[in-house]
Amino acid sequence: MIKSLLKSLLDDDEREVKKLRRTVEVINSLEAEFQELAEEEFPQKTGEFKERLKNGEELDDILPEAFALVREASQRVLGMRHFDVQLIGGMVLHQGRIAEMKTGEGKTLVATLPAYLNALEGKGVHIVTVNDYLAARDADWMGPVLEYCGLSVGLIVHGLSYEERKAAYACDVTYGTNNEMGFDYLRDNMVVSADNMVQRELHYAIIDEVDSILVDEARTPLIISGEGDKPTTLYYQIAKFIPRLRNEEDYKVDEKAHVVTLTEEGVKKVEKYFTIENLSENMELAHHVNQGLKAHSLMKRDRDYVIKDEQVIIVDEFTGRLMFGRRYSDGLHQAIEAKEGVKIEKESQTLATITFQNYFRMYHKLGGMTGTAKTEEEEFRKIYGMDVVSIPTHNPMIREDQADMVYRTEEGKFRAVVEDIISRHQAKQPVLVGTISVEKSEYLSAMLAKRGVKHQVLNAKYHEKEAQIIAQAGQEETVTIATNMAGRGTDIVLGEGIQELGGLYVLGTERHESRRIDNQLRGRSGRQGDPGESRFYVSLEDDLMRLFGSANVEGLMDRLGMDDDMPIEHKMISRAIESAQKKVEARNFSIRKNVLEYDDVINQQREVMYGERRKVLFGEDLKETVASMVDDVIEQAVERFAGEFKYSDEWDLPGFLSYIEQSIIPQPDFNQEDMRGMRKNEVVAFLAEKTQTLYEQREKEMGSEIMRELEKAILLRIIDEKWMDHIDAMDQLRNGISLRAYGQKDPLIEYKFEAFEAFQMMIESMKEDVVRYIFRVKVVQQPEERKTFENQGEEAEKKPVRVGKKIGRNDLCPCGSGKKYKKCCGRGVS
């Protein structure tokens, strides 16, 4: 009784799949009918489905016929017929859930089903993957199936012009990468003309490798930045000074928490070297020293980053790929550059930023697919509201997953790994060896070379050959050493006669801190019912065991008197490894959740700002908006100077008039005597009338058309400037807020409170600047006959078309035109 109850609780996936099989039967019953269709009838069917949706039918009503149509189109165009389990996967994606499908089960083909169905609504479908190669491959491969049914297919990859992007997003189905789509969203919120926006409303996205994008990349913000103006000399000074400090005595390293802290002795040395009295009062120096310590003691070359073409390039810890164009923030990247002696790039100023978590949560509906998601189901459910459904394989999975081999030392482990590889190599069985860093892959490669074993290395340094190396990895006598990248999205196909040798042997040289990454490595073998085998080798010196493992394991090995070359297989050790991984997974989830709680604050503010910006961008007549801002600024000025006094006689009238002249009405045609004896509301009415008269006068001088352009340009420019400064201020607030915990205050509540105050102040400051500019700028004719605006007040000349403070002249213009900044909005800007 209890067993059957437990089984029913555990088999949620089976129940879900069983339910969906009924719809599969309906789709299969339509197959013969759709096989009779002529080619020209496929687009006609699409038109018919769209009409039925307009007449009130739901997508679910059309689903069986839509899936049957796509299956038949795929059979004709590609010679590939969707299996029943692929139809189930397609339904799970359509429901806004995650389909966990093992490697080689045809996820790319599955995506065509929900993509076609949801594209019928005419609002666009995005199929998102992790890199340009996969996006282009999938669009070329699957696009013809959707086009056969009468849909348009677009592709978003790096390097496209603004026109190409706009056309791609206007298609029914758009393939692209998470990075490009996220950046396009940010760029759309920086353009100065509505025509330059490329994306439509975010309707439905299908994310391939969803765990990689929504979990591994969740903490990574997308940032558009301009060049900052902080000098770089301090980084060199600190890089020279750090080697004088001694670990434990001057600073302590906590690898688990990934932090370095100065001891009292260390603080004294810093103060002496930089000739300052109190380090705690010099926050900038303290921050830079801390980043320098991090760069020297926590960040390792060939593990966290590599040096390529005299540049520090980050290595993605989850995929092992080089992350070109990405930089560590907060001066850490500059600290690493100083440590390695390469050119230090200036710190940048953030113009716009968003995390993947918040970008993808803006879609009306989200579906995802991957080979490994079940271990992260709680996170998907809590953060994205998405369930994970395990889809059965088309053929039974017969790969043998062997127990871990545990060694006392890393050296002993690697000796055993080499012996295992040699014995498999002699038997001609292909071997895929997984390592967790560039450094470890090169160490193992040197050991194999010494023993004369021919092999290929696939790591961040050689990623250009990835597809070619992975394509060969299933051939006879092939040994491939790969970091975590191991070609996600590229199947390893077995060569002739390999099945008889036992299939591909996957050997993991270390357990990753996430069980999911280990499962991905195992999943390279045993695809589509092929035979295969996997085994992990572990040592007590591995990072996972050293930082999170149990001391009991080492005690057990001591008691058994085991030497370095003797492995141990014991349930207690397997449990200790799994327990260590669960600890790390829970910790990482907690960090991501905490990051999200903080990021949600700025995200809500971002949505408000971008919403207001779009109103300005699409607004034809902003006169009312500006007039309302003028009224607000007048009321605030009166409140500020009046205080509790009712009559103006009791105010500081000279100071009030001076403020009006500087911030609202330049060269007013009245004096303080004209306001004597007035109440607050009378002063407000008096000034409102004066500003209205001045506004009408300016409009008459300039003409209504130019005045409307002027309003839009000033509003956009000030919104962008204030938002950039606000992002910087919020970053600084967030970096310092953790110190509040020492004062027994909840840092998150404090952050929310102060962020709200900062946002309110930004809005007020924005209104003041708009009012100051609107009454002071005048149009001047430039030689190129471009309209710019000259400030009559104290401030320097301002050009509203310019979006960022320090965008490089050779950078692409953020307005989205696809031209260089100096040839576009930056023309004439020195």
Swiss-Prot record:
Binding site for Zn(2+): 813, 815, 824-825
UniProt binding sites for ATP: 86, 104-108, 491
Transmembrane segments: none
Keywords: ATP-binding, Cell membrane, Cytoplasm, Membrane, Metal-binding, Nucleotide-binding, Protein transport, Translocase, Translocation, Transport, Zinc
Claim: ATP-binding is one of the keywords in the record: yes
Keyword DNA-binding included in the entry's annotation: no
GO biological process: intracellular protein transmembrane transport; protein import; protein targeting; protein transport by the Sec complex
GO MF annotations, alphabetized: ATP binding; metal ion binding; protein-exporting ATPase activity
Main subcellular localisation: membrane
Subcellular localization: Cell membrane; Cytoplasm
Named cofactor requirement(s): Zn(2+)
InterPro entries assigned to the protein according to its UniProt record, in alphabetical order: Helicase_ATP-bd, Helicase_C-like, P-loop_NTPase, SEC_C_motif, SecA, SecA_CS, SecA_DEAD, SecA_motor_DEAD
Family the UniProt entry places it in: Belongs to the SecA family.
Protein name per its UniProtKB record: Protein translocase subunit SecA
